[in-house]
Amino acid sequence: MPWSQKAFAESINEDMYIFLKAVEDNNIVGYISLYKSFDEGDVVNLAVKEEYRRRGIATKLLESLIEWCKENGIGRLLLDVRESNNQAISLYSKKGFERLYIRKDFYDKPKEDGVVMQLKLANDELMESITTI
């Protein structure tokens, strides 16, 4: 769910958050944010202004974030998405994300289940060595 303006402002200056933006005609038309923790990252938000949707902006933002993660040692990405958000689930699936499990009643307004998805960026052998250290 989109963050409040206060939460967004507080996180933008924190080192553990990464923000990438899409700009058109000097206006921010979309952004994606990541919370990084060691070798993992949580995709916290992906948003595109309604009038700019269906132009591939979300895809480009997600691809750019995945590339940034690969270059910066992030081995796995996680995210939550509303179960009814078929467009987002389709985008994430096309980029290699897999469903892990359902979080019952995760979202409010309206109350809805969340789908937890992951994308492994490091191979399983590397991830296993990281988790067993």
Predicted features along the sequence, with ranges:
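Residue-level recognition of the GNAT/N-acetyltransferase active site
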Residues: Y35, K49, R53, R82-S84, ...
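Conserved hydrophobic beta-strand within the GNAT/NAT acetyltransferase core sheet
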Residues: V43, L77-V81
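Acetyl-CoA-dependent GNAT
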Residues: M1-E51, L62-S64, W68, N72, ...
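Accessory recognition modules or surfaces
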Residues: R55, T59, E112-L121
